[in-house]
């Protein structure tokens, strides 16, 4: 039934061997299968069933007789009772019954949660003596049981093999362990002289670990031999079962209460082995166990195998191991019975976390001090027995390994000292954190003494030679700010208090694996030390690591990761003398590198059946998160992350293995890559610093220079949202595609019909369509007003043409109706300052207005009376009431007409004509009323009735006279009314006509009055006639060009916004083209436009003169100006046209240049815009960016003007002039002719003299040209960006006597005259140079060196003249220097001003 457990559990590597149990008097039984590292699921399974092959250890437990040391050690290990069970126990029971009872007891211990005993005395004792369960390699269940019981507990167990009373005592003991106990050190333990020598005081309560977990992991293992005295090196127990010591008899009620409490919290759940062993969630400690178990098997070949650690076994070890100042001893691996070598486990310090937990539990254990004293006594006795066994075994093994031990002592001596120092530092650091002083300080002192004693014992233990199975997790300290180096030190400390050889190897291994990117350096040394070291040190190291992680919580996921690491591990065969060490990171692959205060401890891997030495080292804190410090370790960690290895801990089996070599290569390559990256980054930083330095320097030199970060960027203008801009083009495209016309066989595209949509609302002030509509309405109104009286008075409407009259009448009515229903209903209006465009509101506004009433009256349907009274035109008189449309049309038309006064004159004339029209109609009606031709006054009916009547009306209204006198009363009244109308009304209209005409000529009148006043003023002061003529000319030109004398008068009444709009429309197109203002803020230019003044200059007027103070800048609006220069100041240097600007240098006042540098004269009538310096400064205050830009441009222009002129260097200057005496002699010789000439030599000399004279003349001319050019450049600086137009200038006259041909001429006859005409191929040097006034375009190419060749005095002799202008580089350099000087001076001036 229980056979499946055997298949699951690991098997021992060799045949059962005997352990030293002769003292106990029990026969050695076959060794149990090693189960030190069984996972939690194995322990759970063992609770249910145990393989029959594993004998019970109960009898051996009973047979064990513990001395005072043994009891002391057992007293030290009450929390480690299960650790003893986890260790390999020998087959101590010869009877099946004892085996079954032992198995049942173990199962119960596994099931029942075991609290961690936190009593300080027991912890110290466990740290000092490492309970016999841990120190004796062949420790039996009896010893395991006495770990926490009184001295009589083990004899009673030896006598009573039955588990009943023992089980009850064990329950009581474990209950006491779980309950808080007051920290008290038993005097028996204090009396022991070897307590302090065995190890440092455990600062933290290592007894908090569940002993249940230990019991679950080791149901039966070989029992250890009797302990040896403490004075000698205590050999650690061989792999045995560290059976939990029975607790002293306590209150059963407390036990039942505890059981009920634990059952309520949680029941242990079975765990699948494949997942690394999961422990109960209620386990007080879930830290992984790091154990170094030594198999005392055959020493032929040792394999380094990475085994999985059982968490329950590890927790048991945490309770019993003495690692990190904890009283717990690590579990002993299963030992072969043939070589029952007991290896003692050294105590280690407990991490700070465990100490804190101990403190919390110690506060709860105040009421159990007496019970602790009894357990302390038992532990002391157990420890004494274990020490005796250890010493005996050390003596036997010491003789064999003296030589090897001495060598290893020399190598590891230094390491031991370092370990001791670190242990002391850690103990001191932890001691500071402990809030409880007295008891804890004493425990630390005892722990340190124990460590020293253990080190002495380890010297002899190192001599032992046996195969080692090293299953340890080097758990780094769980400090938050711990670096990689501190982790390696902690790992080295794991074995420091144990066998120093092994500890040194483990320390070197951990340090090298962390700091050297886990290279293989020192691997052989570590392996040899591990192989040569005794199991005592190894077990101690594992115990320390167990203690480090003992107070940490263990998660199921972490256990699964540990089993995955187990799957990757494999044993490597090695020799006995040089065992190979396989080091792998069990969980670094899945753990982040960030610190965590309470990291879960690693899960102990199960032992492999192979005989091997395996060191499982988690490179990072297993299950913990590390927070790294910025040090070299960070770079190493970065290299690890970059390397192909998934884990930061590299596994190696031999120093020369290919894997290690590859790792070294990868580390080297990544290091080189990192160095290259760092170099690149440094170079980039240097470059950035240089750029910043240059910017700061430039800013200090020139304050106008601003960086992109400092200069405020103008906020972009907010654009109005465009309604669906993308949809319209698409629609337009569709419309274009649709408009195709097919005609016959051709298909061509036609223009689409324009779609006009009637507006929803109409602006009556600006809508031209509405004005056009009003024009039609006024036409209809005039039809009615003019023709209704005619049709009524004159007989022009007859039955033959009545239909035409009616057609026109009703057409006018239709226009009226459309105006009311369509247009007037859509007119916008203003209400409360808002323009109302709502249709309903507009309709309501029109309906409520006076105009609507008049429109309704004019459309009264009086035409229906035609049916009764006939067609009478007087019935249409209401149509004339639409006079409001007429007046509105007049206003709208005047607003859009450029010359409104013309329309006003026409309209006034129309009023006069209409009044005459009405009078003529009335006169015909009066004549018809009395009878045509009846009297002399009436119309006689001859000729055109309308024309005759109209003429009579004109004579009557104008009161010209000459009309016939009225005879009847009717005629007298009618004529009186006509006269009255003509005198009163008609005179008013004539006066209005005068006003209209006067208004039309008001400007001209003002111009005349101003001119007359000015002429009167000049005559009064007797101004010269020339000046008066120029003034009159100015008046006339200004009036004709502008239509007014002063534009500013018109702008005064307008608001600023309107003035700006007008100025933009008039002047912006000109100012925006000025190169000086390009790039400036647009708003600045707008503000500047309002400050511009328009001035007209007459021909030859001086705009500015050289040397005067410049306060204005000029922009040419129309006309031209000429820049004059030269020696006389009258040479035209350049002509500026419209759009050019000059005077800006003086205006900006850069470098103190406020004086004019040239004369500027108006060429013809010129209209200039003038910008005053004061106005510009006021504007630039609000635009600092534009100010800086303008100043830069002005400096550049000034620098160009002040450029040094190119000076030609004459390397071979011409010869000096001929002395006068020599000239006289030549003249005399010339007169002598051929006699003194010697074949024409004198003629040649005469020609040479003429050439020299020509050279002198050319030099003088060149001087004059250079002066002219200098003045011209100064004038060009004034012009700014003007487009120069060089007028044609007369070139300087060529020298009269150029040089002769360069080739030697033939000898001339004496009578031959001197050659007057020079050869064209050999002009003199001056003739080669073009005048400086010519532009560069006249010279196609400028050579750096100019060479001129002339004839010498001798025909065969030639003179070489070379001109070398200055180099361009030197020019640029000089320009830069001058620019820097100017900028520096300007910056200083500004600072002084500020």
UniProtKB/Swiss-Prot annotation:
The record ties this protein, via Pfam families, to: cNMP_binding, Ion_trans
Q: Which residues lie on this side of the membrane: Cytoplasmic?
A: 1-762, 826-837, 888-900, 1003-1394
Q: Where is the sequence biased in composition, kind Polar residues?
A: 68-86, 116-125, 654-675
What are this entry's molecular-function GO terms?
Answer: calcium channel activity; cAMP binding; cGMP binding; identical protein binding; intracellularly cAMP-activated cation channel activity; intracellularly cGMP-activated cation channel activity; molecular adaptor activity; molecular sequestering activity
Biased composition, Low complexity: where in the chain?
493-508, 529-554
Per the record, which residues fall in region Cyclic nucleotide-binding domain?
A: 1082-1198
Q: Where is this region: Calmodulin-binding CaM1?
A: 671-681
Could you list the residue ranges that cross the membrane?
Answer: 763-793, 799-825, 838-861, 873-887, 901-922, 932-974, 975-1002
Topology of the protein relative to the lipid bilayer: Multi-pass membrane protein
Q: What tissue specificity is annotated for this entry?
A: Retina, testis, kidney, heart and brain.
The alphabetical list of record keywords is: Calcium, Calcium channel, Calcium transport, cAMP, cAMP-binding, cGMP, cGMP-binding, Ion channel, Ion transport, Ligand-gated ion channel, Membrane, Nucleotide-binding, Olfaction, Sensory transduction, Sodium, Sodium channel, Sodium transport, Transmembrane, Transmembrane helix, Transport, Vision
| Stretches the record annotates as Selectivity filter | 959-962
Query: Which loops or segments lie on the Extracellular side of the membrane, by the record?
Result: 794-798, 862-872, 923-931
Q: Which family does it belong to?
A: Belongs to the cyclic nucleotide-gated cation channel (TC 1.A.1.5) family. CNGB1 subfamily.
Q: Please provide the record's free-text comment about the domains of this protein.
A: The cyclic nucleotide-binding domain (CNBD) comprises three helices and a beta-roll of eight beta-strands from CNGA1 and CNGB1 subunits. Upon cNMP binding transmits the conformational changes to the C-linker domain of the S6 helix to open the ion conduction pathway. The ion conduction pathway consists of S5, S6 and pore helices from CNGA1 and CNGB1 subunits. It contains a central hydrophobic gate that opens upon cNMP binding. CNGB1 displays an additional charged arginine gate below the central gate to regulate ion permeation.
Question: Cross-referenced PANTHER family, in alphabetical order?
Answer: CYCLIC NUCLEOTIDE-GATED CATION CHANNEL BETA-1, CYCLIC NUCLEOTIDE-GATED CATION CHANNEL SUBUNIT A
State what protein this is by name: Cyclic nucleotide-gated channel beta-1
């Amino acid at each position: 039934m229980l056979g499946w457990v055997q298949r699951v559990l690991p098997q021992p590597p060799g045949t059962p061997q005997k352990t030293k149990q002769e003292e106990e008097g029990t026969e050695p039984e076959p060794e149990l299968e090693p189960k030190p590292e069984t996972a939690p699921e194995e322990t759970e399974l063992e609770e249910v069933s145990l393989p029959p092959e594993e004998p019970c250890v109960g009898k051996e437990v009973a047979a064990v007789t513990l001395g005072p040391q043994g009891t002391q050690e057992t007293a030290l290990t009450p929390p480690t009772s299960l650790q003893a069970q986890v260790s390999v126990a020998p087959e101590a029971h010869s009877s099946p019954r004892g085996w079954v009872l032992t198995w049942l007891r173990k199962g119960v211990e596994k099931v029942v949660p075991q609290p961690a005993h936190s009593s300080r005395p027991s912890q110290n004792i466990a740290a000092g003596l490492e309970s016999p369960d841990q120190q004796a390699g062949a420790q039996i269940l009896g010893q395991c049981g006495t770990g926490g019981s009184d001295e009589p507990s083990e004899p009673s167990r030896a006598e009573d093999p039955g588990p009943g009373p023992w089980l009850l005592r064990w329950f009581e003991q474990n209950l006491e362990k779980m309950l808080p106990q007051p920290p008290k050190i038993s005097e028996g333990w204090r009396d022991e002289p070897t307590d302090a020598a065995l190890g440092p005081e455990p600062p933290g309560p290592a007894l908090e670990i569940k002993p249940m977990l230990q019991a679950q992991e080791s149901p039966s293992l070989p029992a250890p031999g009797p302990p040896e005295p403490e004075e000698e090196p205590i050999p650690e127990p061989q792999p045995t079962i560290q059976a939990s010591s029975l607790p002293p008899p306590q209150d059963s009620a407390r036990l039942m209460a505890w059981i009920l409490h634990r059952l309520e919290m949680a029941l242990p759940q079975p765990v699948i082995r494949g997942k690394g062993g999961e422990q109960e969630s209620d386990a007080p400690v879930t830290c992984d166990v790091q154990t170094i178990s030594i198999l005392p098997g055959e020493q032929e070949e040792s394999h380094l195998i990475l085994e999985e650690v059982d968490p329950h076994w590890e927790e048991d070890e945490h309770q019993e191991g003495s690692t990190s100042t904890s009283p717990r001893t690590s579990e002993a691996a299963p030992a072969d019975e043939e070589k029952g070598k007991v290896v003692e486990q050294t105590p280690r310090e407990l991490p700070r976390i465990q100490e804190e937990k101990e403190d919390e539990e110690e506060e709860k254990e105040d009421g159990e001090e007496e019970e602790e004293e009894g357990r302390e006594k038992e532990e002391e006795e157990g420890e004494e027995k274990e020490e005796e066994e250890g010493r005996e075994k050390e003596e036997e093994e010491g003789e064999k390994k003296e030589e090897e031990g001495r060598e290893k002592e020399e190598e590891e001596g230094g390491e031991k000292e370092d370990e001791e120092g670190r242990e002391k530092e850690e103990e001191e650091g932890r001691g500071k954190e402990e809030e409880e002083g007295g008891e804890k300080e004493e425990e630390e002192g005892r722990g340190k003494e124990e460590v020293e004693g253990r080190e002495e014992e380890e010297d002899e233990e190192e001599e032992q030679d046996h195969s080692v199975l090293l299953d340890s997790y080097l758990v780094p300290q769980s400090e938050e700010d711990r670096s990689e180096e501190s982790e390696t030190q902690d790992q080295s400390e794991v074995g420091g208090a144990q066998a120093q050889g092994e500890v040194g190897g483990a320390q070197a291994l951990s340090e090298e694996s962390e700091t050297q990117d886990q290279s293989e350096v020192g691997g052989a040394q570590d392996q040899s030390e591990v192989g040569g070291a005794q199991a005592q040190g190894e077990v101690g190291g594992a115990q320390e690591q167990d203690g480090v992680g003992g107070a940490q919580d263990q998660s199921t996921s972490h256990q699964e990761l540990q089993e995955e690491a187990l799957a990757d591990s494999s044993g490597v065969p090695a020799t006995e003398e040089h065992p190979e060490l396989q080091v792998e990171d069990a969980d670094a692959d899945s753990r982040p590198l960030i610190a965590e205060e309470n990291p879960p401890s690693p899960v102990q891997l199960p032992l492999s059946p192979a005989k091997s030495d395996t060191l499982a080292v988690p490179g990072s804190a297993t299950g913990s998160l590390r927070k790294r410090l910025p040090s070299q370790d960070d770079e190493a960690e970065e290299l690890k992350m970059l390397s192909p290895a998934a884990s930061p801990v590299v596994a190696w089996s031999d120093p020369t293995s290919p894997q290690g070599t590859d790792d070294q290569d990868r580390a080297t390559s990544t290091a080189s890559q990192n160095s290259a990256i760092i170099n690149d980054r440094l170079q980039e930083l240097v470059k950035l610093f240089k750029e910043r330095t240059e910017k700061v320097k430039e800013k200090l030199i020139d304050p106008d220079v601003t960086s992109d970060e400092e200069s405020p960027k103008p906020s972009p203008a907010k654009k109005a949202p465009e309604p669906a801009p993308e949809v319209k083009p698409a629609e337009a495209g569709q419309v274009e595609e649709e408009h195709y016309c097919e005609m016959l066989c051709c298909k061509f595209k036609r223009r689409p019909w324009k779609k006009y949509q009637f507006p929803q609302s109409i602006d009556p002030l600006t809508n031209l369509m509405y004005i056009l509509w009003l024009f039609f309405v006024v036409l209809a109104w005039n039809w009615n007003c003019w023709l209704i009286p005619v049709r009524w008075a004159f007989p022009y409407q007859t039955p033959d043409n009545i239909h035409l009259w009616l057609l026109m009448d009703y057409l006018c009515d239709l226009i009226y109706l459309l105006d009311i229903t369509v247009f007037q209903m859509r007119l916008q209006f203003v209400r409360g300052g808002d323009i109302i465009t709502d249709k309903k509101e507009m309709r309501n506004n029109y309906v409520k207005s006076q105009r609507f009433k008049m429109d309704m009256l004019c459309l009264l349907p009086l035409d229906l009376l035609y049916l009764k009274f006939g067609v009478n035109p007087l019935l249409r008189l209401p149509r004339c009431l639409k006079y409001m449309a007429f007046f509105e049309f007049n206003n709208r038309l005047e607003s859009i007409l450029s010359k409104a006064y013309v329309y006003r004159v026409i309209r006034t004339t129309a009023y006069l004509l209409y009044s005459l029209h009405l009078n003529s109609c009335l006169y015909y009606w009066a004549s018809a009323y009395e009878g045509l031709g009846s009297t002399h006054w009436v119309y006689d009916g001859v000729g055109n009735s309308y024309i005759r009547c109209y003429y009579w009306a004109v004579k009557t209204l104008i009161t010209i006279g000459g009309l016939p006198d009225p005879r009847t009363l009717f005629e007298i009244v009618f004529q009186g009314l006509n006269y009255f109308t003509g005198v009163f009304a008609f005179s008013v209209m004539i006066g209005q006509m005068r006003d209209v005409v006067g208004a039309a000529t008001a400007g001209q009148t003002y111009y005349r009055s101003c001119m007359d006043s000015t002429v009167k003023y000049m005559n009064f002061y007797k101004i010269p006639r020339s000046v008066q003529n120029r003034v009159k000319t100015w008046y006339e030109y200004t009036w004709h060009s502008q239509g007014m004398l002063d534009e500013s008068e018109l702008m005064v009444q307008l608001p600023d916004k309107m003035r700006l709009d007008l100025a933009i429309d008039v002047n912006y197109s000109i100012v925006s083209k000025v190169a000086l203002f390009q790039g400036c803020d647009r708003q600045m230019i707008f503000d500047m436009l309002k400050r511009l003044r328009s001035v007209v200059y007459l021909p030859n007027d001086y705009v500015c003169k050289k040397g005067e103070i410049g306060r204005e800048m000029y922009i040419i609006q129309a006309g031209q100006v000429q820049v004059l220069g030269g020696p006389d100041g009258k040479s035209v240097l350049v002509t500026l046209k419209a759009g050019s600007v000059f005077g800006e240098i003086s205006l900006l006042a850069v470098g103190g240049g406020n004086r004019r540098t040239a004369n500027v004269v108006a060429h013809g009538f010129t209209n200039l815009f003038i910008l005053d310096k004061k106005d510009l400064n006021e504007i630039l205050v609000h635009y600092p960016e534009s100010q800086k830009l303008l100043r830069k441009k002005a400096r550049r222009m000034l620098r160009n003007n002040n450029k040094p002129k190119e000076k030609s260097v004459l390397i071979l200057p011409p010869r000096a002039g001929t002395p006068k005496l020599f000239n006289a002699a030549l003249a005399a010789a010339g007169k002598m002719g051929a006699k003194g000439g010697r074949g024409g030599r004198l003629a040649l000399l005469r020609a040479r003299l003429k050439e020299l004279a020509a050279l002198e003349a050319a030099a003088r001319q060149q001087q004059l040209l250079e002066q002219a050019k200098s003045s011209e450049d100064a004038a060009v600086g004034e012009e700014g960006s003007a487009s120069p137009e060089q007028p044609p200038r007369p070139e300087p006259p060529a020298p009269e006597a150029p040089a002769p041909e360069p080739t030697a001429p033939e000898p001339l006859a004496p009578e031959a005259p001197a050659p007057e005409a020079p050869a064209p191929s050999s002009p003199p040097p001056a003739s080669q140079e073009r005048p400086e006034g010519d532009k560069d375009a006249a010279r196609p190419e400028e050579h750096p060196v100019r060479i001129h060749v002339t004839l010498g005095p001798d025909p065969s002799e030639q003179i070489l003249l070379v001109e070398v202008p200055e180099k361009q580089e030197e020019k640029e350099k000089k320009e830069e220097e001058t620019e820097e000087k100017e900028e520096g001076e300007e910056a200083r001036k500004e600072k002084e001003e500020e």
